[in-house]
Each structure stands twice: as structure tokens, then as C-alpha cells.
Amino acid sequence: MAEKQTAKRNRREEILQSLALMLESSDGSQRITTAKLAASVGVSEAALYRHFPSKTRMFDSLIEFIEDSLITRINLILKDEKDTTARLRLIVLLLLGFGERNPGLTRILTGHALMFEQDRLQGRINQLFERIEAQLRQVLREKRMREGEGYTTDETLLASQLLAFCEGMLSRFVRSEFKYRPTDDFDARWPLIAAQLQ
């Protein structure tokens, strides 16, 4: 019985990995059908539906992976790092690095892969970005408590600026067909971003 569950879990992971790879390829700029996905995995469409009730559920699983990966790592950054600017830098670098290491998933983050799918999926991505922005805002607000001095600019504005930078770099990565990596020249860009944090 345990062997059967492991095989089922492995097949589910294989399906999700194939979907992510298809999103990374030129297929990712077009609607991905279950027929194409089944052919990529080497199974029938019926076999896909034995593991996932719908293609939407496949995207849900990929979004869950994205959420878990990012939120877990953000929490680790907040636990380990106490300096506000260092926290912000690490969170921004995390978002950019995650996108760079997972190009197919970046198409989901930017919404490109979800254009032909249910609106609910885009809503989940919107919620994820809202959570990240709220976390950035909280880090910015905690500066006054941690370091005795806050920012002169509204923390809401600063948080949205940081997130807009991340979203812009991820969109550029997708638009360039993954040529312009989000972390390229990050060490030169960060001082420009940090200079806005006043």
C-alpha cells in the first residue's frame, strides 16, 4: 500500500515538473493543453486526471509550492537577520533568485501562464504578492522599534516600491524569454534601491 502511495506521489510530482518545464519552454507562452502535458509526461489524458481532477488543480499545486517556498524562506530571513536594510535586501534577492532558478514558475508569478486559465488562479498570485508586500511593510515599520529611528517616507509607499522593482525584474525575465536574469547586476542595483529607503 505504501509503495502504491509513493508511486502516485512520484507521478504527481512528475506531472508538475513536466508542467513547469513546459512553462519554461516556448510552449509556456501559449496555452498548455492537457493533451500536450500528457504527451510530455508520456501518459494518457485520463491518467493525468487520475492524479489531478483538473488542470486548474495542477496550477494550484504549483502555486502552493511557490507560496510555501517563498513564505518559509522569508520567515527564516526574519528569524536570522535583525538589520532592517539587510532583511529587505535578502527578501528582494530571494524573490529575484527564486524566479531565476524557476523560470517556468516565474511565468505563473507574472501571470503570463495564467492568462488562459481560471481567474481564481491569478487571484491566488495576487494574494501572495499582497502577503509579501505586507511583510515588507512590517519590516519597514519595525525599524523604529528595532533601531530607534524610522523612515521619513511612508512605509506603504516604500514596500510597494520594493515589490514593484521585483515584479518588474521578473516580468523583464519572462519578456526576454529568460535572457535577462533578475539577479544580474544586483549588487550594482541594490544601492539605487536602498537609496530610496529614507
Curated annotation (Swiss-Prot):
Keywords: Cell cycle, Cell division, Coiled coil, Cytoplasm, DNA-binding. GO terms for biological process: cell division; negative regulation of division septum assembly. Its main location: cytoplasm. GO terms for molecular function: DNA-binding transcription factor activity; transcription cis-regulatory region binding. Residues 33-52 bind DNA. Residues 117-144 form a coiled coil. It is found in: Cytoplasm, Nucleoid. Pfam families: SlmA-like_C, TetR_N. GO terms for cellular component: bacterial nucleoid; cytoplasm. Residues 10-70 form the HTH tetR-type domain. Required for nucleoid occlusion (NO) phenomenon, which prevents Z-ring formation and cell division over the nucleoid. Acts as a DNA-associated cell division inhibitor that binds simultaneously chromosomal DNA and FtsZ, and disrupts the assembly of FtsZ polymers. SlmA-DNA-binding sequences (SBS) are dispersed on non-Ter regions of the chromosome, preventing FtsZ polymerization at these regions. HAMAP family: NO_factor_SlmA (MF_01839). PANTHER family: HTH-TYPE TRANSCRIPTIONAL REGULATOR RUTR, NUCLEOID OCCLUSION FACTOR SLMA. Homodimer. Interacts with FtsZ. Belongs to the nucleoid occlusion factor SlmA family. NCBIfam families: PRK09480.1. This is Nucleoid occlusion factor SlmA. The lineage of its organism: Bacteria, Pseudomonadati, Pseudomonadota, Gammaproteobacteria, Enterobacterales.
